[in-house]
Amino acid sequence: MPQCDAYYTHLILILQLKYLIIYDIIHIMKISLETINKFHHARTQAHIDCLNYHAGLLGYHFPEHDNDKHSGTMMTGYAYINYGRYHPEFNIPETHRSLFRQMHKEHHTTQSHHLEHYSDVSEISDITLIEMVCDWFSASFEQRYLTHEDPDDLSVLKWFNTQLRNNPKYKWSQKQIDLICSTIDFLEMYANYDEVIKIWLPLLSM
């Protein structure tokens, strides 16, 4: 009988797994892949436009920012997550969450505007630091005012001071800290909420 019990237990597990796979497929099919990808492209472009709005206040423009997210496996990895962030009722299958984790790590390690790209922050150029700060502003605005993923509602400066400034993992030079803080201060002073929200609003109707 123990063998019989093991057989039925195994069979039940297989049936449960098949059910979950079928459920995920049916649920995904309710939202077309075209809809998910269209939203992802719009959201990614809004992030880039928001970043370049802030960069423009400083006299910069970063046209190549996040270009890797527009095609291939990177796009697939991010598309379902981006759609789910704005549509909480959308059930993201674990397979797509796992792919996102892989692509997120790859993006952060291969793109120079992310700290994970560097073994030593002294390698970061001043222009790339400015792109980083603008990226933080774009991400912060989205998470605080649109997706509400920042429960602490931290400003960029508070986030930098809390997470990065004194983090032993990053050995910032005083020059880098001064550049980061002066850039943050400038953007917090001159960035206009009404102008920035206009960049993101079209997403809310998609």
Feature locations, PLM:
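Short terminal hydrophobic/aromatic SLiMs and anchors at protein ends
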Residues: 1, 7-11, 15, 19-20, ...
